[in-house]
Amino acid sequence: MNQTVEYLKELTVIASPTGFTEEVANYLVKTLADMGYSPVRTAKGGVTVVLRGENDEQHRYITAHVDTLGAIVRAVKPDGRLKLDRIGGFPWNMIEGENCTVHVANTGKTHSGTILVHQTSCHVYKDAGTVERTQDNMEVRLDEKVTNEKETRALGIEVGDFVSFDPRTIVTDTGFIKSRHLDDKVSAAILLNLLRVYKEEQIQLPVTTTFAFSVFEEVGHGANSSIPAEVVEYLAVDMGAMGDDQATDEYTVSICVKDASGPYHYEFRQHLVALAKAQEIPYKLDIYPFYGSDASAAMSAGAEVKHALLGAGIESSHSYERTHLDSVVATERMVDAYLKSDLVD
């Protein structure tokens, strides 16, 4: 588990908003190659690696996404601040006050800043606490001596430059992990650690399995293509959603029965439940009302597979998120148990 957390820390510090994932993909390629694998880059920019199993006629496909929420420069304002367009689904208040980095395409340089509502100063604006946070009043205050549009553009900053959010990753003495982008870098870290263990211990899985790290999940079309024709089971490893009426918590693995796309495959879900019970893996079944996954994207694209979704319970999703090591352990055990099991009947 220590190595899983180390992978997570390494992943979260790499800026990878959807559409700006080259660095994280290079990290995956190097990490997997150092393990002894032969990773492949997809045309969309994702990374896959295939483990040949005893059954090489029917395959499995397992995914985690390494793209994250982020933003892109929409305009340079007359006062030199930046107007943003969001990447991924989140309300503006979830990034208010967050430090950020502007990745300048023209120069290759980065510039730090902070995302604020225009009416932030409570000594000046009476409506600082009540004004609706919208694209028109949320802005980036750059950490540069700029007071107008010309000075900001002189830095090379232009429309289309990506903006990443400071992850602020912390692991507490009590076992909690606090960070942005636990969705879905926790899952990616879990898959990396399992791949490491399988290689070091020379474990052959019962079924040939493609491990896919996707880079467009947050905008709805992650690992929905390049699925081998032999694949009959598709498992997305992604965060479990917490909140009112939710069963998911920070200490178990969450198995999704339905999200915004509809129900997941019943027999596949029950296969996972049976494994959890047999191996005493703490789990919860849950519904995620406003949610989609790589697996649901694949189904929408026409994949003819059984599909399922599970993951660690993540509190405050798409904000400053939190989970616990207990949930990470349960999720890793669940994925391992599934990959070592027979195909779903």
Regions found by a protein language model. Give the residues of each.
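N-terminal hydrophobic/helix-forming segments and targeting peptides
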Residues: M1-D345
